[in-house]
Amino acid sequence: MTDRLASLFESAVSMLPMSEARSLDLFTEITNYDESACDAWIGRIRCGDTDRVTLFRAWYSRRNFGQLSGSVQISMSTLNARIAIGGLYGDITYPVTSPLAITMGFAACEAAQGNYADAMEALEAAPVAGSEHLVAWMKAVVYGAAERWTDVIDQVKSAGKWPDKFLAGAAGVAHGVAAANLALFTEAERRLTEANDSPAGEACARAIAWYLAMARRSQGNESAAVALLEWLQTTHPEPKVAAALKDPSYRLKTTTAEQIASRADPWDPGSVVTDNSGRERLLAEAQAELDRQIGLTRVKNQIERYRAATLMARVRAAKGMKVAQPSKHMIFTGPPGTGKTTIARVVANILAGLGVIAEPKLVETSRKDFVAEYEGQSAVKTAKTIDQALGGVLFIDEAYALVQERDGRTDPFGQEALDTLLARMENDRDRLVVIIAGYSSDIDRLLETNEGLRSRFATRIEFDTYSPEELLEIANVIAAADDSALTAEAAENFLQAAKQLEQRMLRGRRALDVAGNGRYARQLVEASEQCRDMRLAQVLDIDTLDEDRLREINGSDMAEAIAAVHAHLNMRE
């Protein structure tokens, strides 16, 4: 019977150029008799039979690869059988000329069916020296099907060294797709654009166009996104493309490395474990930090209203009720040193605690993080900065410096950055909260530079200058944290110095604001501690100093510190 099967195999191969249907019948006759005839299963694959059972049988009998063909002295490459290994990345096939190739096709099929663990188990048993890149590629296919994007990147990050330049190009697509799904849109755009020019560009054109469109839309480049979507709708129409064309707010559903790592079942994207205790902790920390702030009564009240409105909106939405959708972006105005950055951290904790943003992340930035030196580069630089803040809060201190006045001329680089920021604030409004901060008059000037900017901010919080008494209270807190204490005389000297600055104007602003308010209090405490230490260092027997004397900042220490700090700040009379 073995001779008969070999003869049937030889006949089936010879019929391939003339009648694939007849060849398929002969290959099927062989497998009906002997399910372990691996070569015949591959013949069926060559004839278009890529059923899951066929792929499984070919893989299950892979140890018999080459037996039938060898018995009639036919090379398996003669069949020209190819198997799909592209997964969601592209229409990629691979020649079935080895047991490893069979395993690759089987793994791709199982991953598409959701049998990720089986696919990975088959690949783990398959490594062949010199073919590690093939296994790495297939693992990226399996991980991609399971939406384990961080693992995809791990598998393809060394693809530049792969000997197969086609698969190396496809790996660039996989890297770009993973980056897009992790909301790293600038990186996704770079990877996908490079991959489009690689040998795999044509085979992966569909995936490249879709994810590049989603990346560009999220970056505010709607016209480029629409152009790609229209090409897809013409060449590869499908419901999601039509939906994205119809609705400009259509976005890629992204995730984070933390969410992937928190899955109860690593292969199930829906098994992300929500730890509400963590959210409750964030809310408690936010409230505690808010309570610790000295003064800021109006600010605290506004933050409480912001928190209440956000909470109730989520409660109403959960019950299917209509919810107003005011912008969550905020403006903080006031002089330096009045707690704006601290309150921004409080807001980040509140929003993360309420589940509005993914994590209590505050990315602190200024003009240098947005504005480049060459035309066209500010948009790229701004996009990268915004990508870092996705899922959290982007805090822009001295935001008025984004667009600078140049002898009455516009600042093209700053305007480019601002336009990009404005688009992303709208496009990423569900994943990004922007807080801009600075002096009230300067922020108003910034808002006038773009018609749509003011409307992006629904909440504006004014930070008042601290009173001298509040600054003294802050100074006492700072000192206590350093195991120091102000004597009554030191406190009085501090208070009088602060009152003098409160009454003075310097460079068109209140001197206390120029000094930095809370920062001024910290500078005086730190300088007075240095003066105290210098004084105590003159004691003949240092070992006799008790804790009270080591802790005490006296009137002369504070007076000397005031003179030094005022000189440094150029505030002397």
From Swiss-Prot:
SMART domains, per database record: AAA (SM00382)
Phenotype when the gene is knocked out: Disruption abolishes EsxA and EsxB secretion, but not their expression. It results in a lack of antigen specific immunogenicity and leads to attenuated virulence.
Pfam families the UniProt entry points to: AAA, AAA_lid_6, T7SS_EccA1_N
Compartments (UniProt record): Cytoplasm
UniProt keywords, alphabetically: ATP-binding, Cytoplasm, Nucleotide-binding
Comment on protein domains: The N-terminal region is compact and probably functions to regulate the ATPase activity and the oligomerization. The C-terminal region contains the ATPase activity and the oligomerization domain.
Assembly and binders: Part of the ESX-1 / type VII secretion system (T7SS), which is composed of cytosolic and membrane components. Homohexamer. Interacts with Ppe68, EspF and the C-terminus of EspC.
Misc remark: Was identified as a high-confidence drug target.
Listed name of the protein: ESX-1 secretion system protein EccA1
Lineage: Bacteria, Bacillati, Actinomycetota, Actinomycetes, Mycobacteriales
